């Protein structure tokens, strides 16, 4: 019995020592460094997210007392892992997460409130675009901050517009007239691929010009119908473009990636895409001739027509546990200040990621002419971004129905009324 008590005492002592060591390692290690475990949604951050990686690299260089331990996994594995870790309350200190899952973690009380960080850094708070902040704020609690901007719109080949004497459009009427000219000359106006039904970015922004964000909350609550006059008018405009031959004749069988190649080959005047294709376009034979446009305004639209699309694709989150560790919290706040400050922003820009803030940045126009044009559009006076992408604020099934409705009209499968009805029925089905 005596031996058992001694053994039990030794086990408890070892346990206390190990617990103490673990606690010390979680904050400041023996070498005086504080470690931040940062989980990211790619397996190789250095290669797959070079802009992000270089910000972290520079931060560590300027803060030798802080080590950022990057934990990289491909997105699906990363998201699954975060969900599993949340069940045992072992979340990483800082991590990337999908918006819907981030909201669930906030609801479960597992995230640090970042409101104080913004209040203590008014320069960053005022520089960040409002929709970047508001997307991850619930009842006054700032539970996340944007990882990087998601910028979408229409790339256009100015050489084709010049060749056929067509001006760069501003209004829907301009776009429809341009489509007629291009159709006569065997040129596709807007290259698209219905096989990848999510590839409707610019058309989702157009939907925002018909009052989408004024209506969607009431629509989801059952107080209004998606099948309303304004949204039907929106689909009518897509149908008009179809009738004047604006889309590829093989749009139903073409993929998004084939649509990109069609544009790069000079066979289409425009491409519905986003910032991720800038480098590929710049390196192509048409690169020097390409510009970027937010899409047309509509005379029958609802509300502000100068709507751009600079939104946050996903947030960075800080675990509540990390916020309760004084050393970690201090290190994390330093990292966030660097990431969203002028230095971090410029490093992002140097690596072809457009700014999330209104900070003045320097772009090497000679090396990256299209990226410079995109940044100019992001910072264009008088244009304000939609709150988010319309498909990102509804359940996935409804988002998919929206894709189907848009391509259904482009393909000639649905009438405008049928398109609106398809989405409305999906909303009713999942209530």
Regions found by a protein language model. Give the residues of each.
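Extracytoplasmic/periplasmic solute-binding protein
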Residues: 139, 143-147, 152, 176-224, ...
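C-terminal capping/gating helix-and-loop segments adjacent to ligand/active sites or protein-protein/ligand interfaces
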Residues: 137, 220, 310, 355-361, ...
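Hinge/lid segment of periplasmic solute-binding proteins
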Residues: 74, 99-152, 176, 182, ...
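Conserved N-terminal structural module of periplasmic/extracytoplasmic solute-binding proteins
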Residues: 21-108, 119-122, 168, 302-304, ...
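Short, solvent-exposed loop/beta-turn-alpha elements that line the ligand-binding surface or hinge
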Residues: 115-128, 211-233, 283-285, 297-307, ...
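Glycine-centered hinge/linker elements that transmit conformational signals in sensory
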Residues: 181-182, 221-251
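A structural signal for short loop-to-beta-strand junctions that line the ligand-binding cleft
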Residues: 93, 124-159, 188-194, 302-309, ...
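Extracytoplasmic/periplasmic substrate-recognition and gating elements
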Residues: 57-62, 67, 164, 244, ...
